[in-house]
Amino acid sequence: MVDTEMPFWSNLNFGMNSMDMSALEDHCQPYDIKPFTTVDFSSINSHYDDILDEKTFLCRNDQSPIDYKYDLKLQECQSSIKLEPPSPPYFSDKPQCSKAFEDTPNSFIAIECRVCGDKASGFHYGVHACEGCKGFFRRTIRLKLIYERCDLNCRIHKKSRNKCQFCRFQKCLAVGMSHNAIRFGRMPQAEKEKLLAEISSDIDQLNPESADQRVLAKHLYDSYVKSFPLTKAKAPGHPDGQSHRQNSRGYTRHELADDGGGSDQGAVREPRAEQGGGDSNLPALSVALRGGVREITEFAKNIPGFVSLDLNDQVTLLKYGVHEIIFTMLASLMNKDGVLVAEGQGFMTREFLKSLRKPFSDFMEPKFEFAIRFNSLELDDSDLAIFVAVIILSGDRPGLLNVKPIEDIQDSLLQALELQLKLNHPDSAQLFAKLLQKMTDLRQVVTEHVQLLQLIKKTEADMCLHPLLQEIYKDLY
């Protein structure tokens, strides 16, 4: 939980935004957590190759709003999660849709070398070329080699490319290789988009399922940015030391563009780190968490097939998934030094949070550790939208009544996620496996969160949580 002496939390928007596992860079401790019954690691294929040669889900617009009833078994209170219109984007008035949704075919299919037709290793000397043709062209140019003339116009392909060097070099020039266009490694974005646009229709004809998965990914992205007022793209950058001012307690406030002539309107209250007593602010945190639950519920009902599930299963999925989603999205507002608060207008340093009295000093540290590892994956909102949907549709949650339809939906989401990551991050071959590992890490973070919350509940006499949150925490891990 949070320190009862920290008013800033009232401003924190919680509604923001097997393969070779030894390749995972995160050295996480093993946890005794039940395995995912719907995650099939065997579907992940290795993306490493030997060095070559010389070296539809449709959006249900007719869905009616649903109130998800939580039976709190309380005599005087029965809470419900009611869907409310999402708040408009706070930090941006322009949608920032990922490039993955602009002419985006199944880009993980190998791009051919423009010279010999072998698999291209990258964008070299102005064209997509394999390692062999790249090295051949480089040596020819650097050493100023002159080959014996050939008038046969030899056909250059993978098996014959070493037979006639003259025709091979002429083919390099014909396809546009030039020393003036030298570029190694990743292809430029403009060239990538042009190439994807050229082969998009062909890929969809060869693999109609990929088109359905792209439609699903686009639908989830649109629902994501609509449901959550503060996404990763909308969040402001972390303080750079110039656009903010910092007090002696480790709290930073961004300068406001218009403060009403120097007034304190819109100012963010600063936290207090004194060791003594203070008024509890947990009710304010409860309000923020309830807002996050509403936003997550709004997004969940836009996942194709979710509203057709048993109502009790919908509630169970939301109950177990809400905090995993909150901590996933909170990572977008965190770095190794601190966390953005007050809808991005303030910054709370990590050192300040660690200086609080126990047990509150231990509250945020696991979230920082997770956020640092999670942010290293460099996901964008189009990736996160599908990942959040996968978290919600986890078929191994305790108490589910009808698991099969949940697993079917998650299987489709996992296929869409794998395609999305291969498309949006073609240079990160292990990304899908790493992201699945983060689902396990999230469960451990939530488990520790609940355990610490129970400790605070015993030590803080004035702790009070909204009945909805009490029901969520009840029997949670």
Curated annotation (Swiss-Prot):
GO terms of biological process kind: cell differentiation; cellular response to insulin stimulus; fatty acid metabolic process; hormone-mediated signaling pathway; intracellular receptor signaling pathway; negative regulation of cholesterol storage; negative regulation of inflammatory response; negative regulation of transcription by RNA polymerase II
Name of one Pfam family that matches: Hormone_recep
SUPFAM superfamilies (alphabetical): Glucocorticoid receptor-like (DNA-binding domain), Nuclear receptor ligand-binding domain
Localization: Nucleus; Cytoplasm
Start-end of DNA-binding region: 110-184
Domain of life, per lineage: Eukaryota
Annotated segments matching region Disordered: 231-281
InterPro entries (UniProt xref): 1Cnucl_rcpt, NHR-like_dom_sf, Nucl_hrmn_rcpt_lig-bd, Nuclear_hormone_rcpt_NR1, Nuclear_hrmn_rcpt, PPAR-gamma, PPARgamma_N, Znf_hrmn_rcpt
Protein name as annotated: Peroxisome proliferator-activated receptor gamma
Tissue: Expressed mainly in adipose tissue and kidney.
Protein family per UniProt: Belongs to the nuclear hormone receptor family. NR1 subfamily.
Endpoints of the signal sequence: none
GO molecular function: DNA-binding transcription repressor activity, RNA polymerase II-specific; nuclear receptor activity; RNA polymerase II cis-regulatory region sequence-specific DNA binding; zinc ion binding
Keywords linked to the UniProt accession: Activator, Biological rhythms, Cytoplasm, DNA-binding, Metal-binding, Nucleus, Phosphoprotein, Receptor, Transcription, Transcription regulation, Zinc, Zinc-finger
Taxonomic lineage: Eukaryota, Metazoa, Chordata, Craniata, Vertebrata
Keyword Repeat part of the UniProt annotation: no
CDD domains cross-referenced by the UniProt entry: NR_DBD_Ppar (cd06965), NR_LBD_PPAR (cd06932)
Motif (9aaTAD): 467-475
Domain notes: The 9aaTAD motif is a transactivation domain present in a large number of yeast and animal transcription factors.
SMART domains: HOLI, ZnF_C4
